[in-house]
């Protein structure tokens, strides 16, 4: 019961964070006039469809314009555009929460739909696929290497990987992406420079999957090289620090095998901060993936954010993406809280 109560409290806290961010976002939209702009665009879309239907029945252009103008005024009243923006706060919160933000100005889905909700939901799985794959790879590489280096402090491999970790942390991901494209796509020509599929994309499930995997190799390698260094360094440092604590010395004095000491007394204690860095690193990588996806022409949320910002900004798309990124962060924090309760029983009391 105590565990369930703590989970409920954590979930409520994360929910309040999400609602607070939503409220602040909607207040900013209203104060800057963007909420009015979004609603007027929705009215404009509805009137456009109405005009297309009524043009077949009302032949007199003047009469058609009078009817359209009356309907436009009715729709503006319906959406509350005749009232101050702060009276529409609850409605706008629901709209952002459900991504009911109308149509994008120039952006579309692959099927040609301009609906913002459909555009974002089409791009979301692509971003999750790319960054989650890279995340799993650098976890499988970084944690074992970090643990290994903590037992070989000062050796050649330790010094070499420490230098690599510093370089990996310092090099911008977008610069590394351009460098990898120059080597593997332009010079060696063994990997595609970008995109998710060949042009034209192959037909069939397995052929399409293999083509997607082929196009994923270079961006995943780039993300792994950019992120695995800090994972190795943090794991090594946390493991090494924990190994010097008194309870580890006592466990060794009792004659426990080194493997048992490492598993029960070192990694178990070092796991919570390591997991924290990994989960928050994933959310930070996704949120900072705008330039990475743009360089590799990967049709994810980062590339969508870039397309919405350049040229004539598409405010509604930017708002929807901001909410999705916030939602991802809140979900990651909740998962982190759950893992903390599992990995560190002391947090439960």
Label each residue range with its predicted role.
Residues 18-86, 190-209:
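Hydrophobic alpha-helical transmembrane segments of membrane transport/permease proteins
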Residues 25-33, 164-194, 222-224, 228:
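Membrane-water interface segments at the C-terminal ends of transmembrane alpha-helices
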């Amino acid at each position: 019961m105590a565990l369930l109560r703590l989970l409920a409290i954590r979930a409520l806290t994360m929910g309040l964070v999400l609602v607070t961010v939503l409220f602040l976002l909607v207040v900013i939209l209203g104060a800057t006039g963007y909420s009015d702009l979004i609603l007027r665009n929705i009215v404009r879309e509805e009137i456009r469809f109405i005009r297309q239907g009524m043009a077949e029945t009302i032949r007199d252009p003047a009469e058609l314009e009078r009817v359209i103008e009356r309907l436009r005024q009715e729709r503006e009243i319906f959406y509350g555009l005749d009232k101050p923006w702060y009276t529409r706060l609850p409605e706008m919160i629901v709209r952002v929460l459900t991504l009911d933000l109308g149509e994008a100005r120039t952006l579309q889905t692959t099927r040609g739909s301009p609906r913002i909700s459909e555009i974002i939901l089409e791009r979301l799985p692509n971003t999750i696929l790319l960054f989650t794959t890279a995340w799993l790879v650098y976890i499988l590489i970084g944690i074992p290497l970090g643990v290994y280096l903590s037992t070989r402090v000062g050796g050649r491999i330790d010094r070499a990987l420490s230098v690599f970790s510093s370089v990996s942390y310092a090099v911008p991901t977008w610069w590394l992406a351009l460098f990898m494209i120059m080597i593997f796509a332009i010079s060696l020509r063994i990997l595609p420079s970008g995109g998710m599929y060949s042009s034209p994309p192959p037909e069939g499930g397995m052929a399409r999957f293999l083509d997607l995997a082929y196009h994923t190799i270079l961006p995943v390698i780039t993300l792994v090289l950019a992120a695995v260094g800090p994972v190795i360094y943090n794991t090594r440092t946390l493991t090494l620090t924990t190994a010097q604590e008194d309870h580890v010395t006592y466990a060794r004095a009792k004659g426990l095998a080194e493997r048992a000491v490492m598993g029960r007394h070192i990694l178990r204690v070092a796991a919570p901060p390591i997991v924290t860095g990994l989960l928050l690193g994933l959310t930070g990588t996704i949120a900072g993936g705008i330039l990475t996806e743009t360089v590799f022409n990967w049709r994810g949320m980062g590339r969508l954010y870039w397309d919405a910002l350049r040229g004539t900004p598409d405010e509604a798309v930017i708002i929807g993406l901001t909410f999705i990124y916030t939602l991802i962060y809140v979900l990651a924090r909740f998962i982190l809280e759950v893992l903390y309760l599992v990995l560190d029983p002391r947090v439960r009391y």
